[in-house]
Amino acid sequence: MPESKYRQQTIRAPRGTVLTAKSWLTEAPLRMLMNNLDPDVAENPHELVVYGGIGRAARNWECYDAIVDALTRLEADETLLIQSGKPVGVFKTHDNAPRVLIANSNLAPHWATWEHFNELDAKGLAMYGQMTAGSWIYIGSQGIVQGTYETFVEAGCQHYNGTLAGRWVLTAGLGGMGGAQPLAATLAGACSLTIECQQSRIDFRLRTRYVDEQAATLDDALARITRYTREGKAVSVALCANAADILPELVNRGVRPDLVTDQTSAHDPLHGYLPSGWRWEEYQKNAQSDPHGTMQAAKRSMAAHVRAMLAFSKMGVPTFDYGNNIRQMAKEMGVENAFDFPGFVPAYIRPLFCRGIGPFRWVALSGDPQDIYKTDAKVKEIVAEDKHLHHWLDMARERIHFQGLPARICWVGLEWRQKLGLAFNEMVRCGEVSAPIVIGRDHLDSGSVASPNRETEAMRDGSDAVSDWPLLNALLNTASGATWVSLHHGGGVGMGFSQHAGMVIVCDGTDEAAARIRRVLHNDPATGVMRHADAGYDLAVECAVEQGLNLPMVAATQGKG
């Protein structure tokens, strides 16, 4: 690995109200970049890796230093351009333009493969930004906890009469994304057994209370699960092992979980999925010396993993892909029926997307947890009738450990995002919170992604692969005045399989911020309603009508009906 990708340095975002940059609009991206590399947040901060295999915040340490310098100098009418983690230009724009525009990992379609990307990465010409790593709005595992919780709750409604009490979830992966699974299962009322091949990840999840217990052996794990489900307790158990070994063994034993999924980093066979029989150190070494052979070995293990998932599905166990592209990897290794079980979005989440509901998140730049608790109360006050959301916020406060700057996520839609943003901005203006708040979201949202094996799988009109939508989302957020906007490729499912956009907006308490918030936090979720209405989803059309969206072709179609 080039020296510039490794530095023994501890980075933490500044706290409080003293500015390093020239305004809060440039201080915010600076703090969030640093927060992504906080050792309590990032998986491997010394190599700039935030989460998801090799999802980085900056291309190398020289680029990181240059980004920090540029942000501290940036004027109120300038925009910094980031190309795959490298600051390439500062241009005069205007005070309502984004302060930062980011493009990460984008390749011309024919060349959008891991092989070509890895060549560019080795030459220092590219950076994998994942979704929120390179767009500087990662908040640790909390960022996916509620989405996973909502998925498990909906699965309980569909398959088990509305409750997961006395049930258990079998899954794997305790990295930045997968680490949310055991806590989400517990919050949804279920037990869980999560397989993870790195002891350090299990230790971190135990320390932060995302996992309750670790079992010493598979027999021990199953005994614990049997006891807890019989007692009706929701307890999460981790086992240090390889999922490609454990899932087939469970099938052979005739063990029957109640839900099966997976969140290993299968999207990246070179860095994210340990081949069966290998040690992690051996995997890292071979990734450098024999990348092709390493990828093939990882994908062979994924094939065994997916065959076991297919076997569970054939038993009648609800089984679903949680968006890591493991089915595609298995299919490439000859598992022709890999897609016989669905992805989580078409199975459980799409009705939410039709209403523009998705992972709305915010961060207290002050570093004071009390600011988040005050915003929690404000959300309850504004979204007064949503008791399910209130329950989530109560559980989040009780169980979720803040990583880095205090943050919160809650899934809300078009109807509420603008109202919440304006309320937060007013809290900053009147001093109810001690410093500005940034509002962002995952790129996994209703109108910001094209990913045929994940968010846009099995679209009603067959438009799964059409990536005009995330491009339009990024353009509209730029025109609307988001503080920073990002457009990435390959997040979640790997090179060649997705394109997606993100936005972040700062609530600094000013009237100008309020005007930007009105535009951005309406237009951003509205693109999700638009995208699904255009695809023919009645729920999205109804939402568009209720919210007064101007969708010419949808209106014309409705008129003909």
Swiss-Prot record:
Gene3D superfamilies: Urocanase like domains (3.40.50.10730), Urocanase superfamily (3.40.1770.10). Binds 1 NAD(+) per subunit. Catalyzes the conversion of urocanate to 4-imidazolone-5-propionate. Pfam families: Urocanase (PF01175), Urocanase_C (PF17392), Urocanase_N (PF17391). It is found in: Cytoplasm. NAD(+) binds at residues 52-53, 130, 176-178, 196, 201, 242-243, 263-267, 273-274, 322, 492. Belongs to the urocanase family. Its main location: cytoplasm. GO terms for biological process: L-histidine catabolic process to glutamate and formamide; L-histidine catabolic process to glutamate and formate. Its EC number is 4.2.1.49. One of its GO terms (cellular component) is cytoplasm. GO terms for molecular function: urocanate hydratase activity. It catalyses: 4-imidazolone-5-propanoate = trans-urocanate + H2O. The keyword Cytoplasm applies. The active site is at C410. Keywords: Cytoplasm, Histidine metabolism, Lyase, NAD. This is Urocanate hydratase.
